[in-house]
Swiss-Prot record:
Species, as recorded: Campylobacter fetus subsp. fetus (strain 82-40)
Keyword Transcription: no
Gene3D superfamilies assigned to the protein according to its UniProt record, in alphabetical order: 1.10.286.20, DNA helicase RuvA subunit, C-terminal domain, Elongation factor Ts, dimerisation domain
PROSITE patterns: EF_TS_1 (PS01126), EF_TS_2 (PS01127)
Keywords, in A-Z order: Cytoplasm, Elongation factor, Protein biosynthesis
Top-rank taxon, per record: Bacteria
Compartment(s) of residence: Cytoplasm
Principal location: cytoplasm
SUPFAM superfamilies tied to this protein: Elongation factor Ts (EF-Ts), dimerisation domain (SSF54713), UBA-like (SSF46934)
Record family assignment: Belongs to the EF-Ts family.
Residues covered by region (Involved in Mg(2+) ion dislocation from EF-Tu): 81-84
Protein name: Elongation factor Ts
Function: Associates with the EF-Tu.GDP complex and induces the exchange of GDP to GTP. It remains bound to the aminoacyl-tRNA.EF-Tu.GTP complex up to the GTP hydrolysis stage on the ribosome.
InterPro entries in the cross-refs: EF-Ts_dimer_sf, Transl_elong_EFTs/EF1B, Transl_elong_EFTs/EF1B_dimer, Transl_elong_Ts_CS, UBA-like_sf
Gene: tsf
Length: 354
C-alpha cells in the first residue's frame, strides 16, 4: 500500500513520533493507522493516539448534587467558541439543563428533547436559547448516579467549569456515609486532576493489559537509551503492568525471591517479617504502573502521595469506624473524545445536532 504524506502527518500529530519513524510504522502495518500506533508505542517512539488529546470544542460542564447527597448529575454542553462559554446566559442554560435532567430522571438525549421545561418542549426551549446566545450549541452528554441505602455521592466541578467529576460510594450505614462526604469530594478533586479512566484494574481485559505492558516496556527502554547517554541511573523494566496480572502464585514467588535475597544479605530471619511487607508493597508498586496511570484506586493519592487511593479509602473507613467501597465514577472534560476534522467547528456542531 502506498503511504501518503497526509497519513504520515496524521500519525505524527497523534503520537508525537518522528516523521521517518511514522512512515516506517505505516509501511510495517500496511497503512493500518491503529497498528502503526501500536508499533510506535512498543518501540517507545510515540504516545497513545488519544482522541481526547485533540479537543475540538468549547463549552461547559455542570455538576448538580442533591441536598441529601443521594443523587448527582453531570452534563456537558458544547458551544462554538470559548467566548460564549463565558456568557452568563450560557452558564445558566447548562446549570438549568443539569437540574432538569436530575429532577425528571432523564436518561437519554432523546428523552431530554421530548421532555417539558417552563411549559414548552425542551427542544423548543433549547432552540430559543441558541437564538438568544447566537451560536450553535449541543447537549453532548449527561449522566446521573444514585446512592443505594447507606451510600453517598459527591461531585466536584473545577473552577474553569471544563472538568467535572462524580463519585459514588457504598457504605455500611448512613452514619458512615455522612462522615466520609468531605473525603469523597476530595477524591473527586483528585480524579479531576489525575484523570483516571476507570475505578479498578478489574475493569481491564487481558488483551488491553498485554498491549499496554508492551507499550510501557518500549517507553522505558527508549528512555533508558537516553539515560545511558547521560550516565544516569536506568529505569527498572517491570515484569508486569497491572494488578490484573499479579496472581497469588506470582506474589508468592516474588515473596520467596525477596526472602532469598534477605538471606543472601545476611539479614537475621527474626526481622524478615518487619522488612518483607514494605518490599512486597514496593514490588507491587513497580509492577502496577498501568493501574497507577489509569485506575482511580491504583493511583497515588494527591493529598498524600505515600499511599494509593485504595489505601487512603481503607484508612478513612477505619478512621470513621465503617466500611466504604467506591462503586461509581464519572469524569467529563469539555470536548474529550471529539476529533477535529476541520477548522469549521460550527459545521461539526451542526452535524452532531442533525
Amino acid at each position: 500500500m502506498e503511504i501518503s504524506a497526509s497519513m504520515v502527518k496524521e500519525l505524527r500529530e497523534s503520537t508525537g513520533a518522528g516523521m521517518m519513524d511514522c512512515k516506517k510504522a505505516l509501511q510495517e502495518s500496511n497503512g493500518d493507522m491503529q497498528k502503526a500506533v501500536d508499533i510506535l508505542r512498543e518501540k517507545g517512539l510515540g504516545k497513545a493516539a488519544k482522541k481526547a488529546d485533540r479537543l475540538a470544542s468549547e463549552g461547559l460542564v455542570s455538576v448538580v448534587v442533591s441536598e441529601n447527597n443521594k443523587t448527582a448529575t453531570i452534563t456537558e454542553i458544547n458551544s462554538e467558541t470559548d467566548f460564549v462559554a463565558k456568557n452568563a446566559t450560557f452558564v445558566d442554560l447548562v446549570k438549568n439543563t443539569t437540574i432538569h435532567v436530575q429532577t425528571n430522571s432523564i436518561n437519554t438525549v432523546e428523552e431530554l428533547k421530548e421532555s417539558s421545561i417552563n411549559g414548552v418542549k425542551f427542544e423548543e426551549y433549547f432552540q430559543s436559547q441558541i437564538a438568544t446566545i447566537g451560536e450553535n450549541l449541543v447537549v453532548r452528554r449527561f449522566e446521573t448516579i444514585k446512592a443505594a441505602k447507606g451510600g453517598i455521592v459527591a461531585g466536584y466541578i473545577h473552577s474553569n467549569s471544563r472538568v467535572g467529576v462524580l463519585i459514588g460510594a457504598a457504605c455500611d450505614s448512613e452514619e458512615t456515609a455522612a462522615k466520609i462526604h468531605d473525603f469523597l469530594r476530595n477524591l473527586c478533586m483528585h480524579a479531576a486532576a489525575m484523570k483516571p479512566q476507570v475505578i479498578s484494574y478489574k475493569e481491564f481485559d487481558a488483551d488491553f493489559v498485554e498491549k499496554e505492558y508492551l507499550a510501557l516496556k518500549g517507553e522505558l527502554e527508549k528512555e533508558n537509551e537516553e539515560l545511558v547517554r547521560l550516565k544516569k541511573p536506568l529505569h527498572k523494566i517491570p515484569e508486569f503492568a497491572s494488578r490484573a496480572q499479579l496472581t497469588d502464585d506470582i506474589i508468592a514467588k516474588a515473596t520467596e525471591n525477596l526472602k532469598a535475597e534477605l538471606k543472601k544479605q545476611g539479614k537475621p530471619e527474626a526481622i524478615w517479617d518487619k522488612i518483607l511487607p514494605g518490599q512486597i508493597d514496593r514490588y507491587i508498586a513497580d509492577n502496577t504502573q498501568l493501574d497507577q496511570r489509569l485506575t482511580l484506586l491504583g493511583q497515588f493519592y494527591v493529598m498524600d502521595d505515600k499511599k494509593t487511593v485504595e489505601q487512603a479509602i481503607a484508612d478513612e473507613a477505619k478512621k470513621v469506624g465503617g466500611k466504604v467501597e467506591i462503586v461509581s465514577y464519572v469524569r467529563f472534560e469539555v470536548g474529550e473524545g471529539l476529533e477535529k476534522k476541520s477548522e469549521d467547528f460550527a459545521a461539526e456542531v451542526a452535524a452532531q445536532m442533525a
